[in-house]
């Protein structure tokens, strides 16, 4: 874990010029403008809960304090709403229980948005999603992947994953399967496969990290089908805290409109997963 955090911090130091080609996702409809809600009236700080072991979304910074894309987005939302907020670290599997026990007010962590989650909690619109992507070796002039291309070239995927199911269903591929992503990435680097289909965030961290040694790059676009790859993540509140959830949704929209979202995204995703 420390090695992964170090890699994220090194990536975050990439000069701005190197990040110019990063595609910044937009999860907000510019035509859908809700009436601006009033921030919740409170005399105490809003308590955000997070975990510190999932870079680059949330992790412990060099000073030991929580940081990451989700954490800094939460802080920016608080500033936009004029609210005083704190960020408290909990073990990931205890975050929702801590929220329900009133030990915090909002969860800012990589908890997937699902119907089951919404049955017991409120959540903002997603501010991040996990795209699926194809990676290729950079020294080969391979065509962008499509059904024909994938059927004619060796492609790898992690066995038993949504990515394997998607590849077989929509690309009619017969991929070479691997037990984990690290093994599949090593196979791509060695040239045993020509395409690797997997989680865009994990692949972005690998492509920009030392283990890839500059071997590989993304090819083609992103794949975001909810049924396979989920709805993403948003800020999660208790069911009764509708005013807070609505205010956070409004803050996220404004952070996107004003460019703050893009600034934070480039800071934590210099090699973009999209």
Predicted region positions:
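Beta->alpha turn/N-cap motifs
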Residues: 49-54, 88-93, 102-114, 138, ...
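Extracytoplasmic/secreted envelope proteins and their assembly/folding machinery
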Residues: 70-78, 92-96, 100, 104, ...
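N-terminal hydrophobic or amphipathic helices and topogenic motifs
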Residues: 1-86, 262-274
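Acidic, polar ligand-binding/catalytic clefts
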Residues: 23-30, 71, 75, 79, ...
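Ligand-binding clefts/hinges and TM-proximal coupling segments of bilobed small-molecule sensing domains
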Residues: 19-30, 162-178, 217-219, 249-274
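Periplasmic-binding protein-like
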Residues: 52, 128-136, 204, 208-253, ...
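Bilobed "Venus flytrap"/periplasmic-binding protein-like clamshell domains
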Residues: 52-55, 64-79, 111-112, 133-185, ...
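Residues that mark the start of a beta-strand
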Residues: 45-47, 153-154, 234
């Amino acid at each position: 874990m420390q090695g992964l955090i170090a890699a994220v911090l090194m990536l975050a130091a990439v000069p701005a010029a190197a990040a110019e080609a990063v595609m910044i996702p937009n999860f907000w409809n510019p035509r859908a403008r809700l009436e601006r809600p009033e921030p919740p009236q409170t005399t105490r700080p809003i308590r955000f809960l997070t975990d510190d072991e999932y870079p680059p979304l949330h992790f412990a910074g060099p000073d030991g304090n929580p940081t990451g894309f989700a954490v800094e987005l939460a802080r920016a939302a608080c500033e936009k709403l004029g609210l005083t907020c704190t960020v408290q670290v909990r073990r990931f599997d205890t975050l929702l229980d801590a929220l329900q026990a009133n030990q915090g007010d909002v969860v800012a962590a990589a908890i997937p948005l699902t119907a089951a989650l919404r049955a017991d909690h409120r959540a903002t619109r997603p501010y991040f999603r996990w795209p699926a992507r194809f990676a290729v070796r950079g020294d080969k002039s391979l065509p962008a992947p499509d059904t024909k291309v994938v059927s004619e070239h060796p492609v790898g995927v992690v066995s038993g994953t949504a990515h394997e199911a998607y590849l077989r269903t929509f690309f009619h591929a017969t991929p070479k399967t691997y037990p984990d992503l690290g093994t599949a990435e090593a196979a791509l680097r060695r040239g045993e496969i020509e395409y690797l289909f997997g989680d865009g965030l994990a692949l972005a961290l690998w492509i920009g990290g030392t283990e890839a040694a500059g071997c590989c790059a993304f090819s083609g676009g992103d794949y975001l089908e909810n049924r396979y790859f989920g709805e993403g993540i948003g800020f999660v509140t208790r069911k009764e805290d509708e005013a807070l959830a609505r205010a956070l949704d409004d803050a996220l929209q404004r952070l996107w409109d004003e460019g703050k979202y893009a600034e934070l995204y480039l800071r934590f995703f210099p090699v973009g997963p999209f």
